[in-house]
Amino acid sequence: VPLSSMEKKERKGFLGTLYELTRDQSVRDNPDRVETYIPPGIETKAIYYNAYDFKYPQLSKVFCPAPNYSAFICGDTPLMKITTNVKNGKKIAVVKNSMGNAFVVYLISHYEQIYVVDFRYSKHNLLKIMKDAQVNDLVFAVGMYAAVSRGTIGMMRNLAYQKNQDYDEVLKQEQAQRLLDSINGVQD
């Protein structure tokens, strides 16, 4: 999708983590901006789950009116599932910290489902989710400074061994809900 065909939103005055940590006046005098590009014709539905299980899913958004990185996928949540109107059967899991939030939105034009896992907060078993949901692709979207730390590597490794509710049960519940919705004439 060409950038020129996308709706652009710009938020000025973004200071970010560097300013938070240093309170440096030169950073404050030269704030950054957050630019959001929304592809035309792409519809999304985002649901986030708490850190430990799949109970109490909450509706969310892919684009939010925040003046910072929370403009992308509304910030950091342990696990988010984004469903789009792209019908190509492709599914991806993104393991990320906050640096990956902006990357996730670029995937909505290319994937039917996107599973976003913040390795800092999620206690879900990523391998189980990928198997149950038949995820095709996996990408790590992590800032370089964090990617090489022992703590980050340990948290990412834990995603393969953590125990939680079977995601297969969530998929069955979603399938049953879609069937009920189709009987009642409700569309996504």
Residue ranges of model-derived segments:
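Extracellular glycan-modifying ectodomains
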Residues: 1-188
